Structure formats: C-alpha cells, structure tokens
Regions:
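Residue-level signature of mid-helix packing/kink "hotspots" within the transmembrane helices
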Residues: 23, 51-59, 143-144, 249-257, ...
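Extracytoplasmic gate region of multi-pass secondary transporters
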Residues: 25-26, 205-256
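Cytoplasmic helix-loop-helix junction between adjacent transmembrane helices
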Residues: 100-138
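Cytoplasmic membrane-interface "Motif A"-like loop-to-helix N-cap segments
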Residues: 67-77, 264-277
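Helix-loop-helix hairpin linking two adjacent transmembrane segments in secondary transporters
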Residues: 133-181
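A late C-terminal transmembrane helix in Major Facilitator Superfamily
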Residues: 320-354
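Helix-to-loop junctions at the C-terminal end of transmembrane segments
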Residues: 57-69, 255-267
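C-terminal transmembrane helical hairpin of 12-TM major facilitator-type secondary transporters
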Residues: 269-313
C-alpha cells in the first residue's frame, strides 16, 4: 500500500473501532447495571476508565513506537484492545469489567498517539488538515455507529452479543493494520532517528498545541456530558434533551472533515480554526439565551470545524524525527484536560445548582483555545 489515502482508510477504520469500543458501556449502561448490580456512579467510573491510561501511557507510547516501529506498536495496541474486550465479554464480575476496560483503554492510548503521528508522516506538507479532519472524524463516527447498532444488537442477542461485536470490529482493525497497511516511503520500518525529543520552539509549540486540543475537546464534553441536564432544566423531557444533544454529535460527523478540507483549500487552516472556535462559542451563548433545536443544529454544523486544523498543528511544529515523542506530549496534555475539565464542570454546576455553568465554562475554554492558537501562531512566526 503506497497511497496516502488508502493508508488513511486503514487508520480511520482502526480508530473507529476504538471509538466503538469506548461507547459500549455508555450505550449499554442499563444492561451493565442489571447484570452486575451496580449504579450510575459505578457506570460513570467504568466509562472514564477507558481514557484514564492516557495519563500514564501517552508519553511513553511515543518512545515505544520510536523503538519498535509505528505499525508494530499500533498492532500491539489493537491486540490489547481485543484482550480487554474478551475479558469484558466473558467476565462475570465487576472487577473483571474494570480490568478489561483498563486494558482496552491502554491499547486505545497507543492507537491515539501513534496513528495521529502516522497520518502526519503520510501527509506532511500537503492536505494535512484535510487528512486530520477525516482521521479525527473516526471518533464521532464510531460513537454514532455504536449508538445506532449496539442497542439493536443487544436487543436481539443480549449484552454478550453487543460486546462480541465490538471485539470483532477491533479484530478487523488488527487484520487491516497487519495485512494491508504499509509504512510511508520516507520512514521505512516506521522508525525514526535517535535524539527525537522536541526542543526549544518545537517543545513550546507542541505544549501549546496539546493544550488547545484539550481545551477544545473539553468544550465539546460540556455539550455531551451536561447538555441533556441543561435542557431538562429548561423544561425539555429527558428523551428530547438526550436526542437534541446527540444531534450535535451526528452533525459533527459532517463539520469535522469540512473544517480540514476548507482550511487546506483556502490555505488558511488557522483562520478556519479561529472562526470555528468563535462560532462554537457563539452557539453556546445562543443556547444559554434561547435553547432550541435550531441552535443545537447550528452548534453541530460549527463545532467540528476546528478539529482538523488543530490536529494538523503538531505536524507543523514537529520535525519528522520528533513526532513520536512529540505526539506523546500532545496526547498527555489532552488526557490531562479531559480528566480535569468534566469533573471541574460537574463540581461547579453542583455548587451553583445549574448545568448552565457547563455551557458558560465551554465559552471560557474556547476563548482560551483561541488565545493559545494566536500565541502559537506568533511563536512560530518569531521562530521562523
């Protein structure tokens, strides 16, 4: 396989399997609680455990890939995801569900860190924002697919059938990675030269880029985590509130790749990034003033625009020999912010007594992300 777009298709499929696996617990929560006699708090912990390993393994993941090769490490991550899925499928105790979830999330960390770097290797210098927009879209696409299919599969065959489906999708991603994927010609074997820790301007750039990505995703989390509660406070029924909030995710499947494509076409990805952040913040404000279906439709059509240009930032600040460890730094910051921000929002909402605080926090996070983007642009101009 020598086509960048064919390689991107393999990477997209593997990451889609990861998103599908992540969504299993949330989509089938009542079935997990019925089987294991747990409550919503336990379910929330099980959901969050998938991302928790990122705080530990994101940074070393880049070094591991540098030593053993990108494709081998990603394939190993998929094997760990399959093993975690197998434990959850066959495990009868809650402790085994926790173990399986942690293992699956550990494998997912390796995919997130290394495959992003692999996309940058294939598309460095051309169509990078477009490729990153498509690649990032695998996450909402996988979650949307899980929301659609898993309840139907569970209704027909029970919880085990749904868990097995997720595991089979991971196996399919593993097969594609081992049988169909090849490393880009510029990096045979998927390894990079030694001495690849980013330094000086590159280190500063990747630190800023990681914070921008984490803050942006934190703002998105405000919609999906607290949107239903906010709408219920404003008088919507729970089913209606959940449906409106999930619509943002479905529309993001369109806006995420669109942002990357537009940024590459007009050759101003940072302009698309900043406009998308500003537009997303405006929709938060509109939702606070007058929450309605059209506002959330507009939010879905705008909120994904910054994703591709943000994910293209590491490829622009890192040299090829620094990408492996640089992406580890990038995703360590992402996992940090994603661990802190939802908990912070929940605590603030509880203290104030309204989920509207989450949307106000979302505006602040987007403003900080925009300031970080402007700072990174100025930093790169000074370093040039």
């Amino acid at each position: 396989m020598t086509s960048p777009w064919a390689a991107l298709a393999v990477l997209f499929t593997a990451r889609l399997a990861m998103a599908f696996q992540y969504q299993v617990v949330a989509s089938l929560g009542p079935l997990f609680m019925d089987r294991h006699g747990t409550n919503l708090a336990d379910l929330g912990i099980l959901i969050s455990l998938y991302l928790l390993p990122g705080l530990v393994f994101a940074l070393p993941g880049g070094g591991i890939a540098q030593r053993f090769g990108d494709r081998r490490v990603v394939a190993s991550g998929l094997v760990v995801m399959v093993l975690g899925g197998l434990i959850m499928w066959q495990g009868q105790s809650w402790s085994l569900q926790i173990l399986g979830r942690l293992l699956a999330g550990t494998g997912g960390v390796l995919l997130n860190v290394i495959m992003t770097k692999m996309v940058a290797d294939w598309f460095a210098g051309r169509n990078l924002a477009t490729a990153m927009g498509i690649f990032v879209n695998s996450w909402p696409a996988g979650i949307a697919l899980a929301l659609l299919l898993l309840p139907l599969i569970a209704q027909a065959g029970g919880l085990n059938a749904a868990l097995a489906t997720s595991m089979v999708l991971c196996i399919a991603g593993l097969a594609l990675m081992t049988l169909a994927y090849r490393d880009p010609p510029a990096s045979p074997g998927g390894t990079m030269p030694s001495g690849s820790w980013p330094r000086n301007s590159a280190l500063t750039g990747i630190l800023i880029a990681g914070c921008v990505w984490g803050l942006y995703n934190g703002a998105l989390a405000m919609v999906f985590a607290f949107g239903p509660a906010f709408l219920v406070e404003r008088g919507a029924a729970l089913t209606q509130a959940s449906g409106i909030s999930s619509l943002v995710l479905w529309l993001a499947v369109i806006s995420v790749p669109a942002g990357g494509l537009i940024g590459d076409r007009i050759r101003r990805p940072n302009a698309v990034l900043l406009a998308g952040l500003a537009g997303f913040a405006v929709t938060f404000a509109l939702a606070l003033l007058a929450p309605s279906l059209p506002v959330f439709i507009l939010m879905g059509l705008i909120c994904g625009l910054p994703a591709g240009p943000i994910m293209a930032l590491p490829g622009r600040v890192l040299r090829p020999e620094t990408r492996a460890l640089g992406m580890g730094i990038f995703f360590t910051l992402y996992y940090f912010w994603m661990a802190v921000l939802p908990a912070l929002s929940g605590a603030l909402s509880e203290q104030v007594g309204s989920a509207a605080v989450a949307f106000q926090l979302g505006i602040l996070l987007l403003a900080l992300a925009a300031l970080g983007t402007l700072g990174l642009t100025r930093h790169r101009a000074q370093a040039a």
